[in-house]
Amino acid sequence: MTTYNHAPYIARAIESVLAQRTSFAVELLLGEDCSSDSTPDICRSYAARYPDRIRLVTSEHNVGMRANYRRTIEACRGRYVAICDGDDWWCDPEKLERQVAMLEADPSLGLCYTRSLRLFEGTGRELHYPEVMLTDFDRLLFNNTVENCTAVARRDLILRYYAEVRPEEHPEWLTDDAPMWLWFAAESRIAWLDAETAVHRMLPQSVSQSGLYRKRIAFCDSLMDTSLWFDARYGAGRHRYRLLCRRSDVALWVLSYHGPVGEYLARRGWPSTPRATDCCSKRYSSDARERLREGDPRPPCALRP
């Protein structure tokens, strides 16, 4: 469990892990990244109360989200690693028991994930995610439905991922979980459990939910660039053209609601003609606004393979 400035949420996240009913021992690693609020005190308090169940992973200086994520995972000692960020929580006390049972029953499985409830902080809006659970590499390239807070993976494969992919050499990747799950899809089999086991809190300040459309586009571009890299390395580049189109589609969808489409066309080096801009605006703006009115933040293409 990685955490940074999660004082209002971290206790609930920790308690949800402690509430798991399992036939095996569970060790909770708290990766606390020198928060400026009371998160460190809360984490230290829990670690002191449960010394046999909780281990604190921290340092004297902030190391950043991605480094904290990695050092916390690498500190794990069990056969399996389950992930829950400090602002999320598990809502099913049988979550770990059921997922580990699936992995134990089939050694070819590297990862098991479940459905989640996305809770949008501030508005209280809820979204049951995903509508379609994907497991194959080709489809996950376009729509990675593996929610981090629902995943349970084999630790030896995670270590292989870090050694083989070397994500630290890719600062352009803005997340650590998306590339990891793409690697699992390419190098092992993925299973899904049809149950809602976790709540993913969508904070306004998170990179994926930023209201600033330039940051939102940068995040979407990063996800597509990650998919392009994995397609080139593990998919022989067979999806390159479609992934490039998808990257543009998603960016244009964001701009159709938040900003000028012509700006993105110019930034990508496309001819920003009135006809092209008008065509893109009409194509995306009406559909995007309708979906957002219905409470669905995803672009029109999000569920298509």
Per-range role (PLM):
Residues Y9-A11, D37-Y46, A67:
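Acidic helix N-cap motif at the loop->helix transition within catalytic regions
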Residues E15-A25:
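Short, acidic, metal-binding catalytic loop of nucleotide-sugar glycosyltransferases
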Residues E32-D41, H61, D85:
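A conserved acidic beta->alpha catalytic loop
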Residues S59-C76, R98:
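Glycine-rich, basic loop-to-helix element that forms the pyrophosphate-binding segment
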Residues V81:
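Short aromatic/hydrophobic "clamp" motif used to bind/position activated sugar donors
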Residues E94-E126:
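Conserved donor NDP-sugar-binding/catalytic core segment of glycosyltransferases
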Residues T114, H128-R214, F219:
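Conserved nucleotide-sugar donor-binding catalytic segment
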Residues L228-R233, H239-R240, L244-P305:
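Membrane-interface aromatic/basic loop that binds lipid-linked glycans or pyrophosphate carriers
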